[in-house]
From Swiss-Prot:
One matching Pfam family: BIR
BIR repeat ranges per the UniProt record: 22-92, 104-169
Protein name: Putative apoptosis inhibitor ORF87
Job of this protein: May act as an apoptosis inhibitor.
Gene3D superfamilies linked: Inhibitor Of Apoptosis Protein (2mihbC-IAP-1), Chain A
Amino acid sequence: MDIVPISPYERMRPLRESKELRIKSFDDHRWPHKNNPVMTKNMIENYFYYIGINDKIQCVHCGGVISGFLEEDTHRISYEHRRHFPKCPVGKYRHPGYHLDAERLKSFKNWRYENIVRKMDLVAAGLFYTGIEDRCACHQCGNELYEWEAGDNPKEEHKRLFPDCKLSSY
């Protein structure tokens, strides 16, 4: 009987689905940027995990590996991801940490406007709650929508206000 090895994409499924597992990967004593928690947070939110060699990180979606980070690269993780791996679906998101519906839904924990617009409709429109008043942002384009009124359709409002967003065409 032939045994087919698990594909790299399937092998990384737990890391894709669990932010906690990605966080734990950076707890390794070999991670050279422990003194820069903002850099580490940006790597985790961009779906990278530490592979345990020098400062090499790997994307759990495309499998791309990036290394050689400088302190000034702290806020360039998303840019470097797109630059090196332009076909990766995660690198195309303005807020990759909210790429999954489940992550966006978690952001609505303190949502007080359910009587005006349902959080499930906002999540379905690709939006996450910023935690400020009724402001929601698109994980794809990064634009914010706010001042919701009863009867607003999040998908339609998103499309009307930001027609160039790729999510607006869905």
